[in-house]
């Protein structure tokens, strides 16, 4: 920015600025000057453009005008919020020296760095979603990933086995900042993330990470946290902790532990599945009409955030799920929703308030909200313990007795304090005797000045005489110009106005010094007492955090009970058999947005019926049917009740979806390539305990290619993997699969045509659909009737002239599959050679030979 040789040409103030800017060259520097934060040079130009503030000049330095922009210090939070939302980071530089005693520029220091992932101020945070920062480390083909929520202290790590798993984890946590090593070589896996920050390799050094983590937690080793055998995750965690300390410039006592996320403990959802199921974000990027938008009526922001974490990370611990179900049932049975929610609402965002207490950045109203939260605990405890069985009572065993902390805050703080401690008026009367004495001296000024004014009027005979005060000249005696000649000789003129003269007398000056001293002493003491409140609260931080987590969970359970009651959900049951059986299931989101009654449908998947071929018209409800099956399963595995008449669900390890696709222009991938990539991931990762949803595979290529791929994928899933699969297709030929393989069945969603119109029945029935209704759907979409008429003529002609009928295509695929000797499932490396060796051209018709040639061609390229 500024060359070294020109540095000495700058003013002392600008030299100080340039030194501080050099410490953080890549981020904006807010430089405190009196009552303003100012930015200079390129920072000023950038801030002016981003914040829509004026770009001006501040004199000259080194012979050049200095570009400058700024904002009042009291308005800085709004500007910071906008910059953070834009993904910018800001270094906050404050005056820490005393201007009255400083020689040269006042001493300044960067006191904190505000970044999107490390903010804790209420105004800068999205209230009902987590604000996470993450770090990723790579060693060969394996990864370490660590996440930190600065607003709660939640610190976690995991070790994704491959880049697909890494991508899925990043899709789950959606970090606002992602730190990555300078030697990271899988940028395609992280390039979609916000706030990418490249960090030096030494920040990921394992031994340094272990030392830093032990120092943070006050431990000798990390075995108590169960992370000691996760070196890649620890390397990422070490970088993350260094970054947090670097930006906060203070201790981080609310980060008290770290935990390992075990994939086997949760149902795995890949990135495509999270997107397709629209859990917390719809396909357009918004939050309307998502699962979370239907379920989330939590009365606390921290409960809302916890619910979204549950949705994105369903657990497989059936005993824990049953405990959640039991708690929801108890809340319903005792009609506790209306009784508990008013108290929970007053608890507020206790979790984030505690983080600000830990960082010593909590404002007076944070502490009064904490006081209010603590005040609700006894009433909540009484309700829960008197009316419910052991699970909710056990939840409250995590909540200690905070009567002493409540009493402290009750005595220390006034009822409704100002926003900031800066101007005082926060500490309550009676809390500290010395503070009360200084305040009495200061507050007694009004009576003293009234008495002095009355006395001086009487002694001088000047009826226009009055005593006033301003910040520049202090106290003064003011006399109108018409009576100024009557001023006594001991009145010393202080200021001349157009219509009056202002004077000072020794007695008033002496009193002014005394009052100003008392105000200054009172403010300094009040700030000291406010800081001491943090010292008194911090020893209890760990137990307070446990309480906030328990109250968050209670809020979620009460919320799910309310949903079950108002939305007519039922408690699902779990079984040991790998299966899903749902009676009259409903899509939890679609049923809320439909004006007409939702048509409920059953689904049954088990060992003998593990793949359902679903046919029917477009818009008939195939995708809705598949999605509702996945969402009902997911809801069961967060412990919620589900939208159905009944549900019985066995062990599920993963949920996969291949529903819909569009071009991935950023990565240069076509619709078909995106489709095949998602399908390949399913074929590699799915197991017998996976729930797989496949919708219209193979439509992005030619008919024969698409049919062959769809057939092969369905056969692989049914015969090799044996996962629980819903397989929707527009290839009617696939309805012959149940005749060939065990465990496959046909179902369809029907429609009725009448007088060139179509009515979708949305009801699932056994068997294959009789037709596709494609032309009827096209007419419904508004395609001109002349085009529909021409299409009907072409359809009749094609059906009449087709020499390669659907039956023949199916037979060719069957025979080709047989003659290949189960080529699809062959594990040998030289599969192509073996396939050709087994081929007997004399046994093939010309049509069969052509189909076989297509398959051989695909094998080589």
UniProtKB/Swiss-Prot annotation:
Record InterPro entries: DNA_mismatch_repair_MutS (IPR005748), DNA_mismatch_repair_MutS-lik_N (IPR007695), DNA_mismatch_repair_MutS/MSH (IPR017261), DNA_mismatch_repair_MutS_C (IPR000432), DNA_mismatch_repair_MutS_clamp (IPR007861), DNA_mismatch_repair_MutS_core (IPR007696), DNA_mismatch_repair_MutS_N (IPR016151), DNA_mismatch_repair_MutS_sf (IPR036187)
Gene Ontology BP, a term: mismatch repair
CDD domains xref list: ABC_MutS1 (cd03284)
Keyword hit for DNA-binding: yes
A molecular function GO annotation: damaged DNA binding
Binding site for ATP: 616-623
Cellular component, GO annotation: cytosol
Record key words, sorted: ATP-binding, DNA damage, DNA repair, DNA-binding, Nucleotide-binding
Keyword DNA-binding: yes
Xref: PANTHER family: DNA MISMATCH REPAIR PROTEIN MSH1, MITOCHONDRIAL, DNA MISMATCH REPAIR PROTEIN MUTS FAMILY MEMBER
Similarity comment: Belongs to the DNA mismatch repair MutS family.
Reported function: This protein is involved in the repair of mismatches in DNA. It is possible that it carries out the mismatch recognition step. This protein has a weak ATPase activity.
Protein name as catalogued: DNA mismatch repair protein MutS
């Amino acid at each position: 920015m500024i060359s070294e040789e020109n540095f000495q040409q700058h003013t002392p103030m600008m030299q100080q600025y340039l030194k501080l800017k050099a410490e953080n060259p890549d981020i904006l520097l807010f430089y405190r000057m009196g009552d303003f934060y100012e930015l200079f040079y390129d920072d000023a130009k950038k801030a002016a453009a981003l914040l829509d503030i004026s770009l001006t000049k501040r004199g000259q330095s080194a012979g050049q005008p200095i570009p400058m922009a700024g904002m009042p210090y009291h308005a800085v939070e709004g500007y910071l919020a906008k910059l953070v939302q834009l993904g910018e980071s800001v270094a906050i530089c404050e005056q820490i020296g005393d201007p009255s005693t400083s020689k040269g520029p006042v001493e300044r220091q960067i006191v904190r760095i505000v970044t999107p992932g490390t903010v804790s101020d209420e105004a800068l945070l999205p209230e009902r979603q987590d604000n996470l920062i993450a770090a990723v480390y790579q060693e060969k083909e394996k990864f370490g990933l660590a996440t930190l929520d600065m607003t709660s202290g939640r610190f976690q790590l995991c070790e994704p086995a491959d880049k697909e798993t890494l991508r899925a984890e990043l899709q789950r946590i959606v970090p606002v900042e992602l730190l990555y090593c300078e030697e990271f070589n899988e940028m395609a896996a992280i390039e979609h993330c916000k706030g990418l920050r490249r960090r030096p390799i030494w920040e990921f050094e394992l031994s340094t990470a272990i030392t830093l983590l032990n120092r943070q937690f006050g431990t000798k080793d990390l075995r108590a946290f169960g992370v000691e055998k996760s070196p890649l995750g620890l390397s990422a965690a070490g970088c993350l902790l260094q970054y947090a300390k670097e930006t906060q410039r203070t201790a981080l006592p609310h980060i008290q532990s770290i935990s390992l996320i075990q994939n086997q403990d949760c149902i795995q959802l890949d990135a495509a599945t999270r997107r397709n199921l629209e859990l917390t974000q719809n396909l357009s990027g918004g939050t309307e009409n998502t699962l979370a938008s239907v379920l989330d009526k939590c009365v606390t922001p921290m409960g809302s955030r916890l619910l979204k974490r549950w949705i994105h990370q369903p657990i497989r611990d059936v005993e824990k799920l049953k405990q959640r179900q039991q708690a929801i049932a108890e809340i319903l049975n005792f009609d506790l929703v209306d009784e508990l929610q008013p108290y929970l609402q007053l608890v507020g965002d206790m979790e984030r308030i505690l983080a600000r207490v830990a960082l010593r950045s909590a404002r007076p109203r944070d502490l009064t909200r904490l006081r209010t939260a603590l005040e609700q605990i006894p009433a909540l405890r009484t309700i829960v313990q008197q009316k419910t069985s052991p699970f909710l009572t056990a939840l409250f065993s995590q909540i200690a007795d905070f009567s002493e902390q409540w009493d402290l805050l009750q005595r220390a703080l006034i009822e409704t304090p100002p926003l900031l401690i800066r101007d005082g008026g926060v500490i309550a009367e009676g809390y500290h005797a010395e503070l009360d004495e200084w305040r009495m001296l200061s507050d007694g000024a009004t009576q003293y000045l009234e008495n002095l004014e009355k006395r001086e009027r009487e002694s001088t005979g000047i009826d226009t005489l009055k005593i006033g005060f301003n910040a520049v000249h202090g106290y003064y005696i003011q006399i109108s110009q018409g009576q100024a000649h009557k001023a006594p000789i001991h009145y010393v003129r202080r200021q001349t106005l157009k219509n009056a003269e202002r004077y000072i007398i020794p007695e008033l000056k002496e009193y002014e010094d005394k009052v100003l001293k008392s105000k200054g002493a009172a403010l300094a003491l009040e700030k000291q007492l406010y800081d001491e409140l943090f010292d008194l609260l911090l020893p209890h931080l760990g137990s307070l955090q446990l309480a906030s987590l328990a109250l968050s969970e209670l809020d979620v359970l009460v919320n799910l009970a309310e949903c079950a009651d108002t939305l007519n959900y039922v408690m699902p049951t779990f079984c040991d058999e790998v299966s899903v059986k749902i009676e009259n299931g409903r899509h939890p989101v679609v049923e809320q947005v439909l004006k007409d009654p939702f048509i409920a449908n059953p689904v049954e998947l088990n060992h003998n019926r593990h793949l359902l071929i679903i046919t029917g018209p477009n818009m008939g409800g195939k995708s809705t049917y598949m999605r509702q099956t996945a969402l009902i399963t997911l809801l069961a595995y967060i412990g919620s009740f589900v939208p159905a008449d009944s549900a019985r669900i066995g062990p599920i390890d993963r949920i996969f979806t291949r529903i819909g696709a569009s071009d991935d222009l950023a990565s240069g991938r076509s619709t078909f390539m995106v489709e095949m990539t998602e399908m390949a991931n399913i074929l590699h990762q799915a197991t017998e305990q996976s729930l797989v949803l496949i919708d219209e595979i193979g439509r992005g290529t030619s008919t024969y290619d698409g049919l062959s791929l769809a057939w092969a994928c369905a056969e692989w899933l049914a015969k090799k993997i044996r996962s629980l699969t819903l397989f929707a297709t527009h290839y009617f030929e696939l309805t012959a699969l149940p005749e060939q393989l065990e465990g496959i069945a046909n179902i369809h969603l029907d429609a009725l045509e009448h007088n060139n119109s179509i009515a979708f029945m949305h009801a699932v029935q056994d068997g294959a659909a009789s037709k596709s209704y494609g032309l009827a759907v096209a007419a419904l979409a508004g395609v001109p009737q002349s085009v529909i008429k021409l299409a009907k003529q072409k359809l009749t002609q094609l059906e009449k002239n087709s020499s390669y009928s659907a039956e023949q295509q199916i037979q060719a695929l069957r025979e080709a599959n047989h003659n290949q000797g189960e080529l699809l499932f062959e594990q040998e490396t030289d599969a192509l050679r073996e396939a050709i060796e087994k081929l007997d051209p004399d046994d093939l018709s010309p049509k069969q030979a052509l189909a076989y040639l297509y398959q051989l061609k695909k094998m080589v390229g």
